[in-house]
Structures are given as C-alpha cells and as structure tokens.
Amino acid sequence: MTLPTRTLGALTVSAQGLGCMGMSQSYGTGDETESVATIHRALDLGVTLLDTANVYGAGANEELVGRAIRDRREEVVLATKFGIVRDAEGHQAARGDAAYVKQCCDESLARLGVDHIDLYYQHRVDPDTPIEETWGALAELVEAGKIRYAGLSEAGAATIRRAHAVHPVTALQSEWSLWTRDIEAEIAPTCAELGIGIVPFSPLGRGFLTGSITSASQLGEKDMRAGLPRFSEENLSANLAIVDTVKALAEKRGVTAGQLALAWVQAKGEHVVPIPGTKRRTYLEQNVGAATLELTPEEISELDAVGEGVAGARYPEHLQRTVGR
C-alpha cells in the first residue's frame, strides 16, 4: 500500500509518520512484540517516516526501532534526535556543543544499527551554546555522510533563522494540534517563508482528542500526562467540551474524532507531516485512515474555533521554559 507523499524541505516522506516514543516511555508499560509489529504494519501501510530519539527510554527506543527495521531499512526515512540530557533524578537540560553532537550521532548510529540517519533533529536548543556551533557540527555530519538532513525541535523563529543561515533546516518538529497552536503566530509562518517542513508531534493532543480519556484517574503512575497541567482532573473536565465538539463533527463526517483531528493538522499545508504516536496496530490503522481525509472549508473553520479557551498550560513551568528558544 502507498500513502500520499509530502516534502520536508528537499526530503520526500509519507504524508503521515509514526512517532515511536511511547513504545519505550511516557505512556505506561511497553510491549516490544506489539511495538515491532506496529512498526512493520506501518511500513506495510505505506508509512515511511519513523521518529525516535536518543533520550527515549535512555536509548532503548532507538534499539527497538533498529531491530524492527533491520531487514526493511530501504523502506524507511529514519529520524532521530539529540540534545536533551537527563540526570539521575530525571531533571532535563539541553546540550548542543559540537563534540557532543558528533558523539550522540555515533551512539545513535550504533543503537539503530544503520550507517546513516535520514533526518537528525536538535531536540532542544541549548541556551549556553551558540546555535551556529551546533549547526556547524550538523553540517559536518552531513558532509561525512552520517546524516542526510538536519532539523530542529521546539525552536523559536529567530533561532530557526540563525540555524538555517548555517545549514538548511529541513524540518521543524513541534507540538501542533487542535488544542496546542502556539506555533501559528510566528514559527509556522517562518517555516513557510524559508521552505522548511513542519512535523507536528502529539497531533492528537496526547490522545485526549480521540475521546478515550475522560478522567485523570485513567492515567497510571508511569504515564507522563499525569504531570501535565491540562490533564489535572479540574482542567481535563473543563476541556471535555472540546472533545464533545470534535466527536459531534466527526460523527457527521462518518470518521473517528482522532481522524478528524489529524485531518485538521494535515490541512495546514503540504509541508506539514504529523507523526501521531502509538504502540498498537489498532490505533495505527485508525490514524493512517486519516492520511487521505480532506476537510471542507466549513469543517476547518468549525474545528479552528474548537481550540479557543483550553484549560491548563501545555507543560509545567520548568519544561515550558525549554521550548520556543
């Protein structure tokens, strides 16, 4: 099966990718057998873009993805990331000095079991290292044949411009969904101007927009959402009105709420490639079903209004400080 394709800068990928993070962390206990089967099913369905990072599962996610694609490497546009460091207590910081960038790349290549990475993202911007140093190192990795293209994640517009002046930014990864629209003010227009693709993660609002989460009590102790302001019991209850509206519109169209939410993100432009994450084939197939779903202008307008007045911040304050730099 083939899916429509889109372009991220000069890189051609399937119109929808697969986020693999949840297979190894953040959303409860993983099942490697089902995760590998999900990756294989994604490839069977025509998904080419697989997304991981060195920090997911402390390297375990890259290893899992590497095992899954060992005999199917030629079918995959492989994306991974560097730049988030965590201490023993789980506190998060960013690092982007040249030596570290190159070290991380070599380590990711080894974990993935590949000789090159197709799209290598700077996961977070290091406020203590000039972006020019980080991107100079990425340009050298391209020259060495270790990576094909370079991207940014959660960077601000000014930083995107500075990085792009050193070496072309192929893609900008950021959270973008019906209830997270921060990038629309300045970052998305900057990407459009510079010919940079956008890869929205959590396009389903970390699962909330599917309608499957109606109470904070559903979130287990290993579920990162339990620590996010929007998923507190009070805010989650207030935000259920958003899901009710999406579900009603989806029912009219004969699709699921999640499919409608994904189609809204996809409608943002031919340079936009969402990467909904899942570790189960059932949800994967629902998501891929949205890849060819086109919304009417009226549907888009109705959905645009849904995200106004979301209760709760996207991240706790200490994490919010790390995005948009």
Show where each model-derived region lies:
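Conserved, mostly hydrophobic/aromatic
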Residues: 18, 35, 50, 65, ...
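N-terminal binding-site loop/beta-alpha segment at the start of enzyme catalytic domains
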Residues: 1-76, 323-324
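Aromatic-lined glycan-binding groove of carbohydrate-active enzymes
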Residues: 183-221, 256
